[in-house]
Amino acid sequence: MLTWTLFGLSSGDPGLMKEITAEIRTVMGNKSRPDYDDLVQMKKTRCALIEALRLYPEPPVLIRRARMEDTLPVGGSGISGGIKVLRGTDIFISTWNLHRAPEYWENPEKYDPTRWERPFKNPGIKGWEGYDPNKMSEFNLYPNEITSDYAFLPFGAGKRKCIGDQFAMLEATVTLVCT
């Protein structure tokens, strides 16, 4: 996450790097180490990390096994009735493709941390709620699957979601701030 964040910041808009540096200096003042409240205030810094997770998710594929026969909805694909899945079928979810899908993301190949500061929605996808930064809980350091209506799954979702997701964001933010 850190490598891709630094890559995105160094190869993108130079003004963005200046904004993030200014944010860190403003929040940190004369402190040498941030506390949790400092990190919560550093929204632009966290958005830079979040955008790197969108473009370069780790892992790029989530694997689940159907515990019973079911029919999966197919969203905006135009296929009616869904896809029948038999019990025991392995289901591969490509977060790499999901996070770069033009149906969900404007300019999906572009590293743009500012996309996380504004709501977005595609009215062409029936039933998709889109993303609204105002829905983020004060306890979340990144937009989770609920906030993005399952269009952003860098740590998975549901009961099988990475248990260390918030710690990973916390640790990455501290490392970026102290670098």
Located regions from the model:
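Conserved cytochrome P450 K-helix/beta-meander segment immediately N-terminal to the heme-binding cysteine loop
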Residues: I93-Y142
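Cytochrome P450 I-helix active-site segment
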Residues: G8-P59, A66-R67, G81, L86-T89, ...
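Active-site catalytic microenvironments for nucleophilic, acid-base chemistry
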Residues: T5-G12, T175-T179
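Active-site proximal loops enriched in glycine and acidic residues that flank catalytic Cys/His/Asp
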Residues: R64-R65, T95-W96, R115, G156-A157
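Cytochrome P450 heme-iron axial ligand motif
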Residues: S137, L141-T179
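Hydrophobic, repeat-rich solenoid/adaptor surfaces of innate immune receptors and signaling proteins
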Residues: L2-L6, T95, A172
